[in-house]
């Protein structure tokens, strides 16, 4: 999915508003995903998935850091996320549908925390951005 200049601007501005809360929002999105889509828990059998667990917070920070990297390299996400794509495709073997589920939960989390900034245009841009990230992360599954 191609991001327009307006989409890129919206994504960078919205992610800039996330600021120091990125890890917190990443963890919240994971918790939402685990509650809304319980089958996603199967990829984390060794995690304490209870609310506020250190493992969920730690993985939420990893998710947020990867998204920060993608925002910073929005014009070259395939190269920036190559190692992460390899990891998910070849080692973790995560079902690609789970990226869509997490993307949805991220959008809900961002909308809850940034209601003034979460305009329809920003929502659409973030949705396109997360779809692009998902496409990159699943590109090595073939």
From Swiss-Prot:
Heme b binds at residue 88. CDD domains: Hb-alpha-like (cd08927). Keywords: Acetylation, Heme, Iron, Metal-binding, Oxygen transport, Phosphoprotein, Transport. The modification Phosphothreonine is found at residues 109, 135, 138. The modification N6-succinyllysine is found at residues 8, 12, 17, 41. Residues 2-142 form the Globin domain. GO terms for cellular component: blood microparticle; haptoglobin-hemoglobin complex; hemoglobin complex. O2 binds at residue 59. The keyword Phosphoprotein applies. It holds the Pfam family Globin. The modification Phosphoserine is found at residues 4, 36, 50, 103, 125, 132, 139. GO terms for molecular function: haptoglobin binding; heme binding; iron ion binding; organic acid binding; oxygen binding; oxygen carrier activity; peroxidase activity. The modification Phosphotyrosine is found at residue 25. Involved in oxygen transport from the lung to the various peripheral tissues. Heterotetramer of two alpha chains and two beta chains. This is Hemoglobin subunit alpha. It comes from Macaca fuscata fuscata (Japanese macaque). The lineage of its organism: Eukaryota, Metazoa, Chordata, Craniata, Vertebrata.
């Amino acid at each position: 999915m191609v991001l327009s200049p307006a989409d890129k601007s919206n994504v960078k501005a919205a992610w800039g508003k996330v600021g120091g809360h990125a890890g917190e929002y990443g963890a919240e999105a994971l918790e939402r995903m685990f509650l809304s889509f319980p089958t996603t828990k199967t990829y984390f059998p060794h995690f304490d998935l209870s609310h506020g667990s250190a493992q969920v917070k730690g993985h939420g920070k990893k998710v947020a850091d990867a998204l920060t990297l993608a925002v910073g390299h929005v014009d070259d996400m395939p190269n920036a996320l190559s190692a992460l794509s390899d990891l998910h495709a070849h080692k973790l073997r995560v079902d690609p549908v789970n990226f869509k589920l997490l993307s949805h939960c991220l959008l809900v989390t961002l909308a809850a925390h940034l209601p003034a900034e979460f305009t329809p245009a920003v929502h659409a841009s973030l949705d396109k951005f997360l779809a692009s990230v998902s496409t990159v992360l699943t590109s090595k599954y073939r």
